[in-house]
């Protein structure tokens, strides 16, 4: 692996990691997803609908002769609303993946001005509870 990708060993041990940052962090998260997908399946929940999988494909291409197979290791789900984020997390929590789970832009849809603040808070609390449940599984 070239040093431009995030350095770590794959497959990942069964530990949980949390990365929080500005939208600029998304490039590093795509590097993480690309690196993980070279060695194993990875589930990606894009809660802000901002991830660019073409960028992930470009990162993967130099490291494999079969980028399509590697891209098939990425299981991507996108949410456009905070209601969809909750539904997505409920579906994943009902059948937790054995592979790494990457959640991108969790808070993005909860800031929607078309959603009442109390509803957004309730949905966020429920979503955080599901993430806690997933981290313990």
What residues fall within each predicted segment?
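Substrate-engagement module of ASCE P-loop NTPases
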Residues: 121-137
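Conserved P-loop NTPase "ATPase switch" module shared by AAA+ and STAND
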Residues: 97-113
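Residue-level signal for alpha-helix termini/capping positions
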Residues: 34-38, 93-97, 136
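Short amphipathic alpha-helices and their capping/turn segments at secondary-structure boundaries
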Residues: 85-101, 128-131
